[in-house]
């Protein structure tokens, strides 16, 4: 009798866990916008399907992962990661020497619960876009927003990635200008999916590096 009771209890617990998992999956699925990017779901055209992210908790629980460029030995990514840390948000620099490693680092970032991923624009080429789409789709499916960091001598018009995969195009420059979106605001407006421009411009001084 005791064994039978124990079996019933195990089955009951298993069913309960399954129900919780299914409900969690359903809630999460609803949190991913249908046609717009995670982290940039509020636009005038998509206001009716806006998905807010008001469960983000404390800033100290947020981590931004920055993927290295293969063209500058990661110097720009390290600069951005340092600036994010100084703004009060945790940041992880993810080194990569080859394109495949960059894509692997994106998946690593998603699987280690990064709240935002910054990818250099020069990682995307006509020949690699198909390969990248798999990783970007994976990040999107997990509700992790992506920011594309503008690379030297490249513009937004050079980016050939569907807009549903990236929340913002971020141009970070070293200069003394004060007309900009701060590092903190650029990251948090995407993490919290607050209304923002598709293109963000941030000026950081040499001292901030």
Q: Which residues does each PLM region occupy?
A:
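Glycine-rich, charge-decorated loop segments at or immediately adjacent to ligand/cofactor-binding or catalytic sites
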Residues: 148-169
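Structural motif
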Residues: 98-110
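Short beta->alpha junction loops
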Residues: 92-101, 123
